[in-house]
Amino acid sequence: MARGINTKCLHLEEEEGCCNNYGSISFPIYQTATYAHPAVGQSTGFDYSRLQNPTCDTVARKIAAMEGGTAAMLTSSGQAANFYAMFHICECGDHIVA
């Protein structure tokens, strides 16, 4: 049986196993600007919060899961989303209705 949106929202935390060492049952909001790296030339996947961060990455995965998609993308504003759509998704000759 397919899960409804309410059930998906309720159980996403459990499915991702995102509990931490402090007993939290929900994913934390990371408010840091920069991230440490294990060594020179090695990255944890996050460099600078304006480009990417664990909180936005988790929210995007959860939105994709709730909507039944394979991926989701977060932008800082509606205008940024429109820009991304026009310059990265659309091809020459496509039409946009706004």
PLM feature spans:
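Solvent-exposed alpha-helices and their adjacent loops that cap or buttress functional pockets
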Residues: 21-24, 64-66, 88-89
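Short conserved active-site loop signatures built around small residues
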Residues: 1-29
